[in-house]
Each structure stands twice: as structure tokens, then as C-alpha cells.
């Protein structure tokens, strides 16, 4: 079998392939009667996710470089955007819908806008929005995320795509290579690799 792709980093890596499948989450529109409690839960999860992202960013800055940490700083900025948060909160309150459905709808709208832009770097913001969306929804639903920090020494990570938050958890001493179906030289996973 031959696989063709674009090299994003110099050199080669020889190791054992570790295939990572990102679990898909199906979000169902669900009515809520206590919108204040739903907003409070959403706000708590949003703050927790921002704190975790800040910790990942600081860890990256200590262990890699500021360039990689900036990607996650961008996530924090997006999760702190009052317009974005207000849209989600207003959907929960006005439509009386669950937080995960509001997060999915608003993040998908923003991701579509970023993806339609001509600038390749701005298009990467679509991946940021999808990453933020998936992390928030999993936390709201109480689901676990992939933990890539425990990959064994000599791993070649193979995935459809890697989100910035997934890549930030990698131990660079253990990962000898990364192969993804999506992305290119300017993708976050290539930058983090």
C-alpha cells in the first residue's frame, strides 16, 4: 500500500503505528425547563475548559515554544469572546434548549465563516472552533476525551485529523511521527509537530 501526502516537517520517523479515532458525539436538541441552571452549568464548563487550555498552553510554552502555545492562546481568546458566549447563552435562554445544542449550533456557524475565508491561516480558525465545540460538548455530556499523553515510546500517531488540544497533550519524546488525512503545512498539527 502506498500513501501520498505532503511532508510538514523534515526527516523521517520509524515506529509503531498507533491509530487514534476521535469519538463522534451526536448532539440531540433537548428542551430544558430551568434555563438558569443550564446557563450556570455551561458557564462553569466554559471556565473549566478555559483553565485547562491555559494550563496546556503554559505546558507547551515550557516544553516546546511560544509559537505552539499561541495556538491555544487563540482558543482561550475565542472562548472569552463575549459575542460568541452571548450567542450561546441567548440560545439557551430564548429557545429553552440544552447547552450542548447551543454550543454546536454557534460553533458550527463560526467554523463555517472561518472555513469560507480565502486566507489559509484564517481557515485554520475553523479547526479551532471545531476543537472548542467538541471539547465543550464532551464536558457538558460528561464524556472522556482522547488522552494522547500516554502513547508509548516510538509511536507514529495516525489519525484522520488532530485538533490543537489533542496535539498539545502529546509527549514529544514518545512520538516519532504524525500522519493525518487532513491538514497541511500550516495546519495546527503540523505546527505542533
Roles of regions detected by a PLM:
Residues 1-192:
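Non-catalytic, soluble scaffold/interaction modules
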Amino acid at each position: 500500500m502506498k500513501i501520498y501526502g505532503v511532508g510538514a516537517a523534515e526527516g523521517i520517523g520509524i515506529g509503531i503505528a498507533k491509530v487514534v479515532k476521535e469519538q463522534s458525539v451526536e448532539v440531540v436538541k433537548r428542551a430544558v425547563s430551568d434555563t438558569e441552571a443550564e446557563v450556570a452549568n455551561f458557564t462553569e464548563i466554559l471556565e473549566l475548559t478555559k483553565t485547562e487550555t491555559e494550563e496546556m498552553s503554559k505546558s507547551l510554552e515550557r516544553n516546546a515554544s511560544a509559537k505552539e502555545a499561541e495556538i491555544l492562546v487563540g482558543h482561550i481568546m475565542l472562548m472569552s469572546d463575549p459575542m460568541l458566549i452571548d450567542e450561546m447563552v441567548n440560545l439557551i435562554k430564548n429557545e429553552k434548549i440544552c447547552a450542548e445544542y447551543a454550543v454546536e449550533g454557534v460553533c458550527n456557524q463560526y467554523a463555517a465563516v472561518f472555513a469560507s475565508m480565502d486566507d489559509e491561516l484564517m481557515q485554520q480558525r475553523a479547526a479551532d472552533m471545531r476543537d472548542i465545540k467538541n471539547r465543550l460538548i464532551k464536558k457538558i455530556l460528561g464524556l472522556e476525551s482522547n488522552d494522547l499523553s500516554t502513547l508509548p515510546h516510538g509511536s507514529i500517531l495516525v489519525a484522520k485529523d488532530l485538533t490543537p488540544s489533542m496535539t498539545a497533550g502529546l509527549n514529544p519524546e514518545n512520538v516519532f511521527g504524525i500522519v493525518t488525512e487532513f491538514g497541511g503545512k500550516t495546519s495546527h498539527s503540523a505546527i505542533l509537530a
